[in-house]
């Protein structure tokens, strides 16, 4: 069944998915992985971080997390 979509204004998109109308199959067109230590991803004003010993596990036993094959 077709969808009727009205006027749309998108100023900015970062790391998201926008769908218009009917959607059957969604899959990312790119992927990435990062490992951050304790408190490394914090943002904002006046941060106070009290971290003791930190050990981030970088071991990843699987070969592929999400395949990119067939994504146009």
From Swiss-Prot:
Keywords: Germination, Sporulation. Pfam families: gerPA. InterPro entries: Spore_germination_GerPA. Induction: Expression is sigma K-dependent and negatively regulated by GerE. GO terms for biological process: sporulation resulting in formation of a cellular spore. Belongs to the GerPA/GerPF family. Required for the formation of functionally normal spores. Could be involved in the establishment of normal spore coat structure and/or permeability, which allows the access of germinants to their receptor. This is Probable spore germination protein GerPF. It comes from Bacillus subtilis (strain 168). The gene is gerPF.
